[in-house]
Amino acid sequence: MIKTESYVQEAAGGMVYRLIPVTEEIIRCVIGKEEIREPESLIIEKKDYPEVAFEAEEKEGRLNVRTKKVLVSLNLSEGCVEWKHADGSKWCTQNKADLTKIDVVRYTTGGEKPIINRVKTVDGERNFIQNLKTEKVREGYRARVFFDWNEEEEIHGLGQAEEGIYNYRGHNQYLYQHNMRIPMPFFVSTEGYGILFDCCSLMTFNDEGRESYLFLDTVEQIDYYFMGGGSMDGIIRDYRYLTGKAQMLPKWAYGYIQSKEQYYTAKELEEIVRHYRELNVPLDCVVQDWNTWDPGNWGEKILDQSRYGDNKECMNRIHEMHAHTMVSVWPNMNAGGKNHQEFFDAGYLLYDYATYDAFNEKAREMYWKQAKEGLFDQGFDSWWCDSTEPFSGPDWGGAVKREPWERFLMVGGEHKKYLDPAVANVFALEHAKGIYENQRKDREDMRVLNLTRSGYASGQKYAAMLWSGDTCADWENLKIQIVEGLNMGLSGYPYWTLDIGAFFTVADKWQNRGCGCNTDPEPKWFWQGKYNEGVKDKGYCELYTRWLQMGTFLPMFRSHGTDTPREIWNFGEKGTMFYDAIEKFIKLRYHLMPYIYSLAGAVHFEDYTIMRSLLFDFPEDREARKVENEFMFGPSLLVCAVTEPMYYGPESTPVDREKTWKCYLPAGTGWYDYWTNEKYKGGQYVTVEAPIDRIPVFVKAGAVIPVADGLVYAQQEPKKPIQLMVYPGADGEFVLYEDEGNNYNFENGAYAITKLVWDESAGRLNIGEREGSFPGMREAVYQTVIVK
């Protein structure tokens, strides 16, 4: 046994094991074939960890390492690792691990001129190099790590996939980057622990057969962190401790964001904002999708002057209306453009000769320089880093969806052609790093916001908001989206959203397709909406409305898609059912803004999670474990999404059914119907009214919810005092967070918190002294409303 102040190392089962206590509840386990290395990590933050008191002893063929909260016991003959509570009760067992030596190769043309097949896909224009050859660069390993889980134990997390699997027990999952897949090398257990693999290669999770294991495609060694945080919040706190705190997003990012594929001029963006202001419907951002470049210059970060020559003036007028903009940027560029040529001349392109090398710091700086000069300096406020899994093109076509294993090999293999296989899953992470770090160098007065389709562990510290990709408009997909959002939160990632209404709406009427594809009659496996006529179909209007109602309670509230427009006036006019329902929920989002922005503060300062699986707050409720279409929005609001039609099917076909919805109310607390204030006991199913203008929302007894009236943009100063809505029935508390909203002064203490404590026995709300201050701080005036 080798023991130092920071780790213990020993040979076991033909391997070398190093156990490194990081905190009292986090222990790192590194397994090497012959030696242990300390390579630089792309996902674990560099920091000086405090010394952790631990004991280590070898006894009866086992190496036992104990901190105050965790006991890890290594079987020296077999190499099995038992993870236990400090009192000896077991969490789980890592049964064994194996490392198989492989040749790590890269693909090059070997000095030949590349033979480039440029293909126009639904997901953009792509280069496919026809004469690539493999070249060995080093030796590495493929690894498997086997686990033994309790029969009733559930495994959640692993990022976002597309199948809607909530509990991964009994399932196989492929972890690779794809248009609708965002892998995370992290899972949590209902037994109260989590495991994070420091692995950036392709991975799989397998619990289908007799053995349960994770497969790591290309590594130097096995390297994982065991987190015994106990509660889900505790585990996520441990995860963020390792991977970095989530950055504060600008306050306006929590307002309503209007997007579609696509707007065509700067003036059109301005008119969208103006129309919302004229309707008095709240709005904070309008989004410019792809195709801002000159014709043929795909991915160029230079505006087409014939359509965006007045961009800066239009952006200024948008800012005068207290709104913001977001612009789409791509990592790949066509040859012939100025941006592409600059990367080519510097040698900063990957071997598809189109995509910049985001792993190169100088290349990231060049990308930022181009984006800043061509877009940021022209008035755009934030980034939409689209297609950040730039090598999934081979799967993004054809009429038949391939088998899961085939897609994994195809798309993963394409990433390994152009990236080192050890980092095949983290292009998007490095891309986000470049945007965040370089914008911060230039503009400390503007918070970074990067909406991106792919990501990885630690991306939260780069202000990267992930979204679920190009989904299809049908009710089943809406259900799946909720599950995937819950698993993303259980993966430690707090910033996730979706395309409200789904991206693709058209079924088989290809003439109505967007994305410039209305002349392509070939079926696409992913273009499988149910509504050929889009907003002209009442069935789609109902689906969109229900999607938006659920989306009101996500970290980002954003409408987007192709095939059909998404602005509110396309769903009718004021006084009609869909328009009024959409308006009601957009205004509800702003009514809740003090509550929502306080949750945003908690995400940064307290490592909180906004969209919360019921596992976070009701871990002992066995029935709550089964619920996949409900979630907590912060500590107080239970959101029950409506995921079935009640009024219309496709082609405006009337549906005859009750306008009610069955909801589960978790045990251990009382609940209020948000709309009627009717009280319910927890631990039961209830059926409540769910007409088109509302979905069931319940408030937890003891909740204190700060709200504001009359806002049309997030940073607007309320004309009336903030109301503190109290729902009696239990003691409760909430922390109101405030700051300037769009700079980084909060990092130096420029923010304020107010503790709100409801004393049930006294029937009194105690409003604490405001702690802290910041420039422009509003007067601390409140109106307390006790709900009866």
Language-model region placement:
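Short, exposed beta-strand/loop patches in secreted or surface proteins that constitute
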Residues: 1-2, 19-20, 51-58, 63-64, ...
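A low-complexity, Ser/Thr/Gly/Pro-enriched, surface-exposed linker/loop concept
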Residues: 2-5, 18-63, 101-103
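Short, isolated positions in well-ordered beta-strands
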Residues: 17, 64, 70-73, 90-91, ...
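Extended Gly/Ser/Thr-rich low-complexity repeat segments
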Residues: 20-24, 38-48, 73-87, 96, ...
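Short polybasic amphipathic segments
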Residues: 63-64, 79-85, 671-673
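Catalytic-domain carbohydrate-binding cleft regions of carbohydrate-active enzymes
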Residues: 89-106, 118-687, 691-693
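Accessory, solvent-exposed terminal regions and/or long lumenal/extracellular loops of proteins
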Residues: 699-788
